[in-house]
């Protein structure tokens, strides 16, 4: 059993703990929160022995071998680095860090300390995403794709009311492309590799983060358009178009349904059964990396490439975070 700790006590942390336990590979051993009351409240639902209000104390503790980080984006890098330096394996929620420089430093730290660093981009681990990748030859010569994820944020009204929620605050390295737009970008890179170039546009809020945007990725023979928003909903599926037909994906982040629409024929449902908690697959992947002591793994290349193009997209749209090095602004 891999003894792990969690940083963050929100809904996504609970989902991860439940699925981590379901893999049969993990045991929750510690919880961190700035508030002991909050840590205790979270721990009441699990048999947890250790509660921490000090990150350094938890990082030094022999009670844990690994940590799951689900804190605000701007804290991901410093917390990841701290635990790697104390020889703990790290699974960090996406995005792994605020920019490419931080991701490079995190990967270097994992290598220096010979510990697994794994970015929690669940989509790449899903059975239906793997099916989607295997099904690409069905469409023949590819010409274009639309990867779409637009979802009205439950915190947007708070922003409109004059509050400053983390979701729309550049101090926390947040915004549309860093949150749900990430799924579109990372999925494209997981399917087709890095583009030749990108052209990005976005509508910025007064806070300085992007509310929504569009990115066109140039792959030479084909293009991929990313559409993302945190201030509006979309009912459109994502679509990959080729000369022999199209692949249609409902809710890209979870690949809820994958269909093949042959040119001139009826649509075929290719969807495979998936666990209701789609975090199960990334939890299993993290456990396997630890068991195999696979410090070097393909996920690191995907994390770096995604960070590289996230950084470039923000450079083009003018979204700047305090974490960015302003003497060499957003260089990719």
Placement of each model-derived feature along the sequence:
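N-terminal Rossmann-like dinucleotide-binding module
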Residues: 1-46
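Beta-loop-alpha module in the N-terminal Rossmann-like domain of NAD(P)-dependent dehydrogenases
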Residues: 46-109
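Hydrophobic residues in well-ordered beta-strands that form the structural core
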Residues: 52, 92, 117-119, 249
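C-terminal helix-rich "cap/oligomerization" subdomain common to oxidoreductases
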Residues: 66-68, 104, 285-332
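Rossmann-fold dehydrogenase core element
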Residues: 105-123, 141-144
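Predominantly a Rossmann-like dinucleotide-binding segment in NAD(P)-dependent oxidoreductases
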Residues: 124-195
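Contiguous beta-strand/loop segments that form the cofactor/metal-binding neighborhood of enzyme cores
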Residues: 184-255, 284-292, 329-332
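Active-site loop of classical SDR/Rossmann-like NAD(P)-dependent oxidoreductases
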Residues: 270-284
